[in-house]
UniProtKB/Swiss-Prot annotation:
GO terms for cellular component: plasma membrane; proton-transporting ATP synthase complex. This is ATP synthase subunit beta 2. ATP binds at residues 158-165. Gene3D superfamilies: 2.40.10.170, Bovine Mitochondrial F1-atpase, Atp Synthase Beta Chain, Chain D, domain 3, P-loop containing nucleotide triphosphate hydrolases. It is found in: Cell membrane.
């Protein structure tokens, strides 16, 4: 193992000089051990990742934790390999940081467990496999209009505060309990409070026993936020490749991965690209996304929350992510303003799986009719705003009336939001979702007030609500 010395510290960027030309390779992990002020840990260990070889036997590195206490002249040891993290069943029920160290309060992992490098090649073309099996989520708007594929990549797009994290938590609740397989959750640059809440919720429900959690949250330096997604992915890949499992990978939030990459890029002195992003944006995204795939021995189904800065979908960060996805669930602020939750835009959300060959003729026909009706309602809204409902033809009045019921019926109570809403969450199987909307489109429930359709699960709940309102059903 070659040794070097710290010659410069600039925030999370540390320059290290090695003697005798024994330079570490790009992505190698370097370690600094130094005395700490903290009483409980008299020595601290800082891991650095090599980013650039500058010449004159100097490498520029990115720190994976705070560089407080690091000084020029300190000894640096080259570990000879990239960062490695624990893999296998030992990771289930545990919470890790970017380096694979446990950050929950349980016993530390034994030192002799298997560890894999976080930088790996994507599976080769002949190892890839595609499936056309639908993954049922129990969320009506998703299952009906933008269904998810097993082994697919799904993006949850939305601006600040429209419900991405709540939706991803509901998907974890529904799929992890119904699917019963192994899940990996990577918290990338999001709020520590949300990660803490999620951990205790999963502990209470028992789902944690089949879940590995990895966090690099908002308070971490950019190096940790940039690499923590790879840590989570490495754990998921092992279950896919070695244990031949179908794995669920949840990432909240992919935008923070890009944002951390942008910070690192600026710190390394690269020329910024469009809107100040790193020039390597597409490459970094591709390296991550190409590894999240299904092979002929196992699958990874990934559900990724993607923050949309200022609700602008043309921003390079969300726009680059779009190209890699099989299904998109778009959350819209205008729907939250109407009190429709989940605030999924039924016209903007898309899925490769919405075809008669995959979902079946009946499901496809009902979904396209729902979209046609909502599109017609959208076109008529300007006329209604200017002239009012009275100027519409009888056919258009009926379309508007049904479209409003459909729009409200696409809303639903979530299990993870019970403490906020005071109403029980609901899981609706796909068959019941299709049947409910088919009857609604046929005019079977035209006599039921619109408010009865708000925030309910199955169509039977609508009828019960209508009875409570004093309406004959």
């Amino acid at each position: 193992m070659s040794k070097g010395q710290v010659i410069q510290v600039m925030g999370p960027v540390v320059d290290v000089k090695f003697e005798g030309g024994n330079l570490p390779e790009i992505y190698n992990a370097l370690v600094i051990e130094y005395k700490s002020d903290a009483e409980e840990a008299p020595t601290s260990q800082l891991t650095l990742e090599v980013a650039i070889q500058l010449g004159d036997d100097v490498v520029r590195t990115i720190a994976m934790a705070s560089t407080d206490g690091v000084q020029r002249g300190m000894e640096v040891i080259d570990t000879g390999s990239p960062i490695t993290v624990p893999v296998g069943t030992v990771t289930l029920g545990r919470v890790f940081n970017v380096l694979g160290n446990t950050i929950d309060l349980d016993e530390p992992l034994p030192s002799d467990i298997k560890r894999n490098k976080i930088h790996r090649e994507a599976p080769t073309f002949d190892q890839l496999a595609t499936t056309t099996e639908i993954l049922e989520t129990g969320i009506k708007v998703v299952d009906l209009l933008a269904p998810y594929l097993k082994g697919g990549k799904i993006g949850l797009f939305g601006g600040a505060g429209v419900g991405k994290t709540v939706l991803i938590q509901e998907l974890i609740h529904n799929i992890a309990q119904e699917h019963g397989g192994i899940s990996v959750f990577a918290g990338v640059g999001e709020r520590t409070r949300e990660g803490n809440d999620l951990y205790f919720e999963m502990k209470d429900s028992g789902v944690i026993e089949k879940t590995a959690m990895v966090f690099g949250q908002m308070n971490e330096p950019p190096g940790a936020r940039m690499r923590v997604a790879l840590t989570g992915l490495t754990i998921a890949e092992y279950f896919r490749d070695e244990e031949h499992q179908d794995v669920l990978l949840f990432i909240d939030n992919i935008f923070r991965f890009t944002q951390a990459g942008s910070e690192v890029s600026a710190l390394l002195g690269r020329m910024p690209s469009a809107v100040g992003y790193q020039p390597t944006l597409a490459t970094e995204m591709g390296q991550l996304q190409e590894r999240i795939t299904s092979t002929n021995v196992g699958s990874v189904t990934s559900i990724q929350a993607i923050y949309v800065p200022a609700d602008d979908y043309t921003d390079p960060a969300p726009a680059t992510t779009f190209a890699h996805l099989d299904a998109t669930t778009n959350l819209e602020r205008k729907l939250t303003e109407q009190g429709i939750y989940p605030a999924v835009d039924p016209l903007a959300s898309t899925s490769r799986a919405l075809s008669p060959d995959i979902v079946g003729e009946e499901h496809y026909a009902v979904a396209t009719e729902v979209q046609r009706l909502l599109q017609r309602y959208k076109e008529l809204q300007d006329i209604i705003a200017i002239l009012g409902m009275d100027e519409l033809s009888d056919e258009d009045k009926q379309s508007v009336s049904r479209a409003r019921r459909v729009q409200f019926f696409l809303s639903q109570n979530f299990h993870v939001a019970e403490q906020f809403t005071g109403q029980k969450g609901s899981y609706v199987p796909v068959k019941e979702t299709v049947k409910g909307f088919k009857d609604l489109l046929a005019g079977k429930y035209d006599h039921i007030p619109e408010d009865a359709f708000r925030s309910v699960g199955r169509i039977e709940e609508v009828l019960e609500k209508a009875k409570d309102m004093g309406v004959e059903v």
